[in-house]
A protein has these predicted regions:
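Mid-domain alpha/beta scaffold segments of enzyme catalytic cores
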Residues: 1-237
Length: 237
C-alpha cells in the first residue's frame, strides 16, 4: 500500500442502527442500517444500508417498494440487513423468512450492491442459498459469532464477516474464544457497533489488534482495502 492509500484509510463501522457522532469525522466511515420498524430514515447525505429485518417481516405496513427505492439511492452502499433468525420461529416458520431473504438477494443482485445479512443459528441455510444464487453480489454476515472453521468456510465461499463488540465483551460467545485462541486471516473481515451507540468503532479495532497482536494502522489499512473490494469501488477520503 502506498503512503497516500494509508493516509486515506478510515475506521470503518460497517453496520449500526444508531446515530453516530463520528459520522462527520474524516477518520471514520459509518454505515447506518435502516429497517422500517426499527429506526429512523437515514439523514441526508449519510451512507446507509436498507432492508426488512427478519423481526419485522409480518408487519403488513412495511412498504417493500419503499425499501427498494431507498436501496437505489447513491448513498445506499448495501442492501439489508436481511436474513434468517431461528431464535424467533420454529423450523416450520423459516419459510416466510427465507422468501423475504430471497427478495433481498435478488434486489442486491439487481442493484449490484452488497447484501448485509442477519443470521441466528441458520448458517447452513445461508450457505445453501449462497450456492443457490451463484452469480450474486457480495455478502456480509453481520455480528458474526462463529468458530475458526466457520470463518474459514465463509472465506472459502467469499462471504465477508463483520465482528461486533461481543468478541471481547462476552465470556461465552464462540467468536470470543475464536479470536482469543486463533490467528485470524483478515481476508473479508470487518467491524461494527450494531446497536451499541455507546461504543466507538476505534475501540473495537484496538481490542482486535491487541488480541491478534497486530499494529492498529496495519489493521485499519487492511479493513479499508476489504471495504474497497466489497463495494467494488475506489473510496476517497
Amino acid at each position: 500500500m502506498t503512503s497516500k492509500e494509508s493516509q486515506s484509510a478510515k475506521f470503518i463501522d460497517l453496520h449500526g442502527h444508531h446515530s453516530s457522532s463520528k459520522s462527520e469525522d474524516r477518520d471514520f466511515l459509518y454505515i447506518y442500517s435502516y429497517s422500517p420498524k426499527i429506526n429512523d430514515l437515514p439523514e441526508e447525505g449519510q451512507f446507509f444500508s436498507a432492508g426488512v429485518h427478519p423481526w419485522e417481516i409480518e408487519d403488513a405496513r412495511i412498504s417493500f417498494e419503499g425499501v427498494k427505492r431507498l436501496c437505489g439511492e447513491s448513498n445506499c452502499l448495501m442492501v439489508g440487513e436481511a436474513g434468517l433468525d431461528r431464535s424467533i420461529v420454529d423450523d416450520s416458520d423459516l419459510e416466510q423468512q427465507e422468501e423475504v431473504f430471497k427478495w433481498h438477494i435478488q434486489l442486491a443482485n439487481e442493484l449490484k450492491k452488497p447484501l448485509i445479512i442477519h443470521n441466528v443459528k441458520c448458517l447452513s441455510e445461508i450457505f445453501r442459498l449462497h450456492k443457490q444464487y451463484p452469480n450474486h453480489s457480495n455478502w456480509v454476515l453481520h455480528d458474526f459469532n462463529g468458530s475458526l472453521s466457520d470463518i474459514q468456510e465463509c472465506q472459502k465461499r467469499s462471504i465477508a464477516m463483520s465482528l461486533g463488540p461481543r468478541f471481547y465483551e462476552s465470556q461465552t460467545a464462540r467468536i470470543a474464544h475464536t479470536i482469543s485462541d486463533h490467528k485470524i486471516d483478515l481476508n473479508l473481515i470487518f467491524f461494527e457497533t450494531d446497536e451499541r451507540g455507546d461504543i466507538n468503532i476505534q475501540t473495537i479495532y484496538e481490542k482486535f489488534a491487541q488480541k491478534q497482536e497486530i499494529e492498529i494502522d496495519d489493521l485499519k489499512d487492511r479493513i479499508w482495502q476489504n471495504l474497497k473490494a466489497l463495494l467494488g469501488t475506489n473510496l476517497t477520503s
